[in-house]
Design a protein with these regions (language model features):
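C-terminal catalytic/motor cores of large multi-domain enzyme assemblies
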Residues: 4-5, 14, 18-25, 37, ...
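Short, Lys/Arg-enriched alpha-helical microdomains
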Residues: 28-48
């Protein structure tokens, strides 16, 4: 007997499950297992759908007012679930709207760009096995070089330029891909496409939402000033939606920089069919340890998202270390 005055029933977990599925009362079945334990064979020999014993009175102690809200909540949840047996499938539009009171929202129809972005990002997360590598880069030497180069730059004419930190990042990523050429690749079912040039796409946010990723082609061959001026032109045409398909199609990697928004670190979704994307955070002063002493340095965190079908962990780490080496010693990008 247990504390409620009812007989304790000994049964295997499998027997209990089978009894529930068949609507059988375990208390009415004689067990043939050790110490009278009900086992699978006992359930299989039992007459089908033997009536269950009444539930203990304690189960009926809850009032209807206590049970009804839970029941109603379950009904609402079930009503909001998408039709069909697939667990985790997307909810229908009607199911989503049913969760919110009429008049509590405004419906903004998707434009073509938003639909294409949604399709590509969903495709990327569903078909590309992402993994992520992060490290911190010291920027003090880069910032000093940038300041000096900008001071030397012509102020007008076709050779005028003004370098940004992002221009150095584009160049460093392009040269890192040349240093680690196995990472400059694209997955296909027939084999890997190993790219000869580093075509670096750069995410450009658009007014009102959305983005384009115009491509700096053969970025490893271009000077910082060429990259800077070309990027300014592409970004301007992207924001006014005047890019040609050639300007944003292709690319062997992408850079997404949210540092100007104060974001310290994030992970980006790979832009298919590319195999990597570099997420760049803000530059900020942090305490660092150098020769057992605490120093203040300007640091930047970056996270590389890679397609694991193309780039293994060690290869991704090698690529990120090559990028860091160029960033921390920018003179190597000027040769």
């Amino acid at each position: 007997m247990d504390g409620n005055g009812s007989h304790r029933i000994f049964a295997s977990p499998l027997a209990r499950r089978l009894a529930r599925e068949r609507g059988l009362d375990l208390g009415a079945i004689k067990g043939s297992g050790p110490h009278g334990r009900v086992i699978k064979s006992d359930i299989e020999r039992a007459p089908a759908r033997r009536a269950r014993r009444p539930e203990p009175a304690t189960r009926e102690a809850f009032s209807a007012s206590e049970i009804e809200p839970v029941t109603e909540q379950r009904k609402m949840v079930r009503a909001a679930q998408p039709a069909g047996p697939a667990l985790g499938s997307a909810m229908s539009d009607a199911s989503v709207r049913a969760l919110y009171a009429p008049g509590s929202y405004a419906l903004v129809p998707h434009d073509t760009m938003r639909r294409v972005m949604a399709e590509r990002l969903t495709l990327a997360k569903q078909t590309i096995p992402h993994f992520y590598l992060s490290l911190d880069c010291k920027l003090d030497a880069l910032l000093a070089a940038r300041k000096r180069l900008n001071a030397m730059a012509p102020e007008g004419g076709p050779r005028a330029f003004r370098l940004s930190v992002n221009d150095f990042i584009i160049k460093a990523m392009a040269m890192a891909l040349q240093t680690v050429p196995a990472a400059n690749a694209t997955w296909t079912s027939e084999g890997l496409l190993l790219h000869r040039s580093s075509d670096v796409a750069v995410a450009v946010a658009l007014p009102g939402g959305g983005l384009f990723t115009p491509v700096i082609r053969t970025a490893e061959m271009k000077s910082l000033s060429e990259i800077s001026n070309e990027m300014k032109d592409l970004a301007s045409r992207a924001r006014s939606k005047r890019l040609n398909p050639h300007d944003y199609q292709g690319g062997t990697t992408t850079i997404s920089n949210l540092g100007m928004y104060g974001i310290a670190r994030f992970e980006a979704v790979i832009n298919p069919p590319q195999a990597s994307i570099l997420a760049v955070g803000k530059a900020e002063k942090r305490p660092v340890i150098k020769k057992d002493a605490v120093k203040i340095a300007t640091m930047m965190s970056v996270t590389l998202s890679v397609d694991h079908r193309v780039i293994d962990g060690a290869l991704g780490a090698e690529l990120l270390q090559a990028f860091k080496a160029f960033i921390q010693d920018p003179v190597t990008m000027l040769a």
